[in-house]
């Protein structure tokens, strides 16, 4: 797969430790896509809803501590964001992030395939163009606080905050 030059340049700009000014990011609470039989029978589970917020907060904290990002407060758009399906709203995540003054909109979705098998996805979109800058995902096993947190840590450490992530090989 070829990556368009402008996307590659933006990825390198966003993910480069040498970037002079920290990028302003809006990290929205993660969303759950529950395609499991358990989800169809039982509906949303309180522990999973809490984990979605916990994982988003983990991402916010890691980005702020990295020093390459300014994590913006989502309070002014939280109600609208929570009322939207950010993964399929036609770019409303970018519009909300623009309202906050963000350079990058960060959304995440956890897909629950079964009671045991899940997948975490994180997406970064440029608020000027609406284009996807990068996406990362990881499958994980076990629907526990620890498995969700470890998966987010893996994506942060080995993708989003990795020094050479997105650089040509």
Predicted regions located by residue number:
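N-terminal, post-signal-peptide region of Sec/Tat-exported proteins
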Residues: 45-76
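C-terminal/domain-edge helix-coil "capping" segments
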Residues: 20-37, 54-57, 65-67, 94-99, ...
């Amino acid at each position: 797969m070829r990556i368009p030059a402008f996307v590659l340049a933006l990825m390198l700009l966003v993910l480069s430790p040498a970037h002079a000014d920290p990028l302003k990011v809006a990290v929205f609470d993660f969303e759950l896509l529950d395609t499991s039989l358990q989800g169809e029978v039982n509906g949303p589970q309180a522990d999973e809803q809490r984990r979605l917020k916990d994982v988003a907060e983990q991402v916010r904290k890691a980005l702020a501590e990295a020093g390459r990002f300014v994590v913006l407060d989502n309070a002014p758009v939280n109600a609208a964001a929570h009322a939207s399906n950010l993964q399929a709203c036609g770019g409303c995540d970018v519009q909300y992030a623009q309202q906050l003054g963000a350079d990058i909109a960060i959304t995440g979705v956890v897909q629950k395939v079964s009671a045991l098998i899940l997948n975490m996805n994180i997406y970064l979109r440029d608020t000027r163009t609406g284009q996807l800058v990068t996406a990362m995902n990881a499958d994980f096993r076990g629907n526990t606080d620890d498995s969700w947190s470890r998966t987010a840590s893996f994506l942060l450490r080995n993708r989003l905050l990795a020094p050479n992530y997105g650089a040509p090989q």
